[in-house]
């Protein structure tokens, strides 16, 4: 199998789905432009691809998790917008950051708008598949807990600034929350939507978290 081609095809599917959930026609125009700014600047689309590949890995079809795949990318970009504000970063993906172009108030609401759409897209996915209530609850429980854990990771990252005595355990805990949590949620949600069994869901969730930790170690 041509892995690169496989991922490119799924990335294109995700782009189309993102446009459906957060189109350029969103009003007011400044909200659409600010919210979509980093989405249109590129990115690896790693998280949505994890959703789709995990879904397929347990026997589901790629279309079974397409709304969720878009939702995870929207959530990721929400965290990037707010992260850039806190870190005072001026560039990301070779373009100016949202708060630099539109100011912090607009950047905050642009991120919030993306976050709101996450749950709408997930709800649509669950409704379309007619997910059993217990599995739908697990879907939203997963995304909610991951969102909170990302906040914990970011808080730790901020507290670590200026410290020179950070232990390996502290560092791994921080990146596990800040980066690993969202990739864990991505692979777990894909497995849930693909109708994976408990062992499959658990294994893919653990895999996603480890991928996230490894990714962040390499990035750092």
Model-derived segments and their meaning:
Residues 19-220:
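Mg2+-dependent prenyl diphosphate-binding active-site environment of isoprenoid biosynthetic enzymes
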């Amino acid at each position: 199998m041509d892995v690169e081609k496989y991922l490119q095809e799924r990335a294109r599917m995700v782009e189309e789905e993102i446009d459906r959930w957060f189109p350029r026609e969103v009003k007011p125009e400044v909200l659409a432009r600010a919210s979509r700014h980093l989405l249109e600047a590129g990115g690896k689309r790693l998280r949505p691809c994890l959703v789709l590949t995990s879904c397929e890995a347990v026997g589901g079809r790629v279309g079974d998790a397409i709304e969720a795949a878009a939702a995870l990318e929207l959530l990721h970009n929400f965290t990037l917008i707010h992260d850039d504000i806190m870190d005072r970063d001026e560039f990301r993906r070779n373009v100016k950051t949202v708060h630099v172009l539109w100011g912090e108030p607009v950047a905050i609401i642009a991120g919030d708008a993306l976050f709101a759409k996450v749950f709408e897209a997930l709800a649509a996915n669950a409704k379309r598949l007619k997910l059993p209530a217990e599995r739908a609850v697990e879907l939203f429980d997963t995304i909610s807990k991951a969102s909170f854990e990302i906040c914990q990771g970011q808080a730790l990252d901020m507290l670590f600034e200026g410290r020179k005595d950070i232990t390996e355990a502290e560092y791994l805990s921080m990146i596990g929350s800040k980066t690993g949590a969202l990739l864990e949620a991505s692979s777990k949600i894909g497995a849930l939507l693909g109708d994976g069994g408990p062992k499959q869901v658990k294994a893919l969730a653990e895999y996603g978290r480890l991928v996230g930790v490894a990714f962040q170690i390499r990035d750092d």
